[in-house]
Amino acid sequence: MIAEDREYGTFESVTQAYQQIISHTLQLRRYEFETGCMIMFSANSGKCEMLSNGWISMISWTSETDTAGSLTLDICTEGGQCKTYSARGHILCSKNITSISQKNEGKEKVLTICHDNGKLHLTYITVLKSGLDCDIKDQKLEKLFEKEHAERKKQDDDYKKKALKQKDKRRSEQKILEDCDKKDEKKRMDDTEKRKLQEDRRNEKQDLKKRVDDTEKRKLEDDRRNEKQDLEG
């Protein structure tokens, strides 16, 4: 196997401008950098290119099984320098590293991106195969990817469990508040009905007393009128 074309990039003062999760398999990230350096080798010759004040757009897609996908990297500076790197095939993703290997007949491309501590590193190589079809895999790197992938999955599962627990807790607290509100409302209605009943009874007593007083008054008037008639007769 012969490493034909190799490109290495290092970018300083890198900040992530935004991350857009279009779906659980498709993501778009945009980084901004102050300075950068691209070193390019072809066969036995190489050159260095300096970059400044630009942005990097990274579009990554992964399959449902997280084993295949595509990665596209666009780099542009305010001076008009633009570069594009892309590959599709076997993909490995971790917290800070994304690497993809694209195999064609007699050739293999490897694109690796690492973003950590304000720096972004890029490696893009093309390997020519000779003789038997060899599988170039860095066992240590793959184990690191698998370990970080397992840790990320565990963190996601823990977060989902915690979120579900908090949701159940909020639902329980909301039900308690609703039950308290219902009890308070029932108590207010009972108090209102009780006051209305007391008011009705008080009014009935007053009406009864008034009728009794009126009856006694008429009877007294009748007695006086009869006495007067008896005296005159």
Swiss-Prot record:
Entry superkingdom: Viruses
Annotated localization: Host nucleus
Biased composition (Basic and acidic residues): 170-233
Family matches, as InterPro entries: U79_P34
Keywords in alphabetical order: Host nucleus
Major localisation: host cell
GO cellular component, one term: host cell nucleus
KW Cytoplasm (keyword) present: no
Annotated family: Belongs to the herpesviridae U79/UL112 family.
Task performed by this protein: May be involved in DNA replication.
Name of protein: Protein U79
UniProt source species: Human herpesvirus 7 (strain JI) (HHV-7)
Gene: U79
